[in-house]
Amino acid sequence: MGSGGRGVRRVSDPSKVARAVAEVMRGQPGPTVVQGYLSEADDGEKRIFWVDGHIVGGYLRRRAPGAFHHNLQRGGQPEATVISESDRTICDAIAPHLRRNGIAIAGLDIIGSALVECNTLNPGGVHYAESFRDSNSMGATECPIASQVIRMLTTVPTWKLPEANPA
């Protein structure tokens, strides 16, 4: 899958979806995802940071004027956001799956009330979430995100890695 919005397209005409998918697949080998457009995307996309079972912060990404992508590499702008009860419900629902698969750090992308992406290798933007920490519902008394990540990486995990499948 791409990153930074590479390969992401908006196709309004249903008769052109197959052609758009074929073009993406030619340019990027590997899995391709096709999903319906969420009208809530017009309000932005939240990146919520999840560390070892806990939400530790987040921020909102808004599109550049006239753009389709929320990605910061494509002109999107970060803003402070509130971590809502709906966001917490989504994160709680995905948490068992993340833990079962040995994932301890994730950037969860949410549009409206839908989880649209789970970034586990390098969930970018922690510094934005850190800078907006006092503005969201996490509060100024919460431990900084980077400190929580470091603490999680340097302590005994509360979860087990999945067992490898024998080949």
What are these model-derived regions, one by one?
Residues M1-G5, G27, S137:
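Short, basic, helix/turn surface patches
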Residues M1-G2, H69-G75, N119-G125:
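Short acidic (Asp/Glu) and glycine-rich catalytic loops that position anionic groups and cofactors
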